[in-house]
Amino acid sequence: MPRLLDRQTPVHFIGVGGIGMSALARILVDRGHSVSGSDPRDNATTQQLKTLGVKVFRQQDATCIDAVTGRTAADSPVVVISTAIPESNPELQRARQQGLEIWHRSDLLAALIEQQPSIAVAGSHGKTTTSTLITTLLLEADQDPTAVIGGIVPSLGSNGHSGQGKLLVAEADESDGSLVKFSPSLGVITNLELDHTDHYSCLDDLISTLQRFAGGCDRVLANHDCPILQEHFQPTAWWSNQSDESVDFAALPLSLDGDRCVARFYEAGQPVGDFTLPMAGLHNLSNATGALAACRMEGLPFNQLVEGLAGLKAPGRRFDLRGTWKGRHIVDDYAHHPSEVQATLEMARLMVRSGRSPLPSAPQRLLAVFQPHRYSRTRQFLDGFAKALQNCDLLLLAPVYPAGEQPLQGISSNALADRVRKLKPDLEIAVAENLDQLTELVIQHSLENDLVLAMGAGDVNGLWSRLTS
């Protein structure tokens, strides 16, 4: 690993447009590396990378490697891949033929983490939001951290930033188990729940992986409100939103509205002060409490952190108001697990019920648009999705986003609709055959002042652009 970090080695990313890969590419550019990459997608991310001087190839084949390989080993790039790149990828095969040094994305992130004091955020849900909030609080406190985040940090306008401060903040993705390579100064674990069943055969496998991650951290901060963490982990410090007893940090809600949370912060059972979080939902209060606790463990004064809370915003695709179309409020959210869908719908329902929201006007109805992600995942969580999706006034379902998987017999959005109907027969549900039809269904069924909430990790986030075009 030292060759990449100690010398100005060129670096080539296969799949540079991915949210995790592009963050690392940005940081290496900031640090003076010559960076190139390939990605068949031409999107805002690849366009931004080009403006930074990154050479981006639209194809993924041997010619990309030939174009960036130097005459000597010192002139040749380190090639970075992610778990999404298969061994059959022709670009990767060419790199191996050329004898180039190949790193997994997690190896590069591990090397960056080892370089400086770092905070790595892990867990099944809330990683991106919590790491974004930590980054934002540090920025507001003039700490200027380096950040490697799985979403766009609003205060940075980017997912990657090479700061001048001493700290690095990273999102530690558990989906492929590679987070066990990380050795941060402080590990933050938001919660644990079975997910990524393509990698983990059971919950015990996931617990074991996170225990290995925790073992590599100098200190660990964990969410006491998660029963699985309570049972299987012994962190340095706990946080809670349920009680200030037997925990190191707590934020107990004083009021919850559709546009904010007001809470009292405790340390070691003693009240420290009240704060207002300009975000709705108990899950966001939990994320913010973890972020505050992490910053307190790094020695930042509470009063300074509270000042930074005023301008907090969630990362991109986390209840992201895209705009208002013909009086309909179009919101995009990355929720693609039953617990995430439930929390997001509860937050949206609170906005409708309370009449208070960050939207331009108070929404009258909640129209949920959901795109299941992967056939295997839909099969695993079919009942959980059905239960979560009841909490809306109208439900529109997009086809399953395959993410490279082949269809499974009996697993479809129609099957999900049938499960929801059994639980809530009077709920109006429509299933689209494609995204064009989904857009037409939104146009036909939505009314002025509806909150149209599009959820999923696939391409359902294109709903806004389809409506406005």
Swiss-Prot record:
GO MF entry, a single one: ATP binding
NCBIfam families: murC (TIGR01082)
GO terms (BP aspect): cell division; cell wall organization; peptidoglycan biosynthetic process; regulation of cell shape
Compartments it resides in: Cytoplasm
EC numbers: 6.3.2.8
Listed pathway(s): Cell wall biogenesis; peptidoglycan biosynthesis
UniProt: ATP binding residues: 123-129
Family: Belongs to the MurCDEF family.
HAMAP family (alphabetical): MurC (MF_00046)
Source species: Synechococcus sp. (strain CC9605)
GO CC annotation, single: cytoplasm
High-level lineage: Bacteria, Bacillati, Cyanobacteriota, Cyanophyceae, Synechococcales
Major localization class: cytoplasm
Keywords: ATP-binding, Cell cycle, Cell division, Cell shape, Cell wall biogenesis/degradation, Cytoplasm, Ligase, Nucleotide-binding, Peptidoglycan synthesis
Protein name: UDP-N-acetylmuramate--L-alanine ligase
InterPro entries xref list: Mur-like_cat_sf, Mur_ligase_C, Mur_ligase_C_dom_sf, Mur_ligase_cen, Mur_ligase_N, MurCDEF_pg_biosynth, UDP-N-AcMur_Ala_ligase_MurC
Catalyses which reaction(s): UDP-N-acetyl-alpha-D-muramate + L-alanine + ATP = UDP-N-acetyl-alpha-D-muramoyl-L-alanine + ADP + phosphate + H(+)
Cysteine pairs bridged by disulfides in the record: none
Free-text function comment from the UniProt entry: Cell wall formation.
Pfam families assigned to the protein according to its UniProt record, in alphabetical order: Mur_ligase (PF01225), Mur_ligase_C (PF02875), Mur_ligase_M (PF08245)
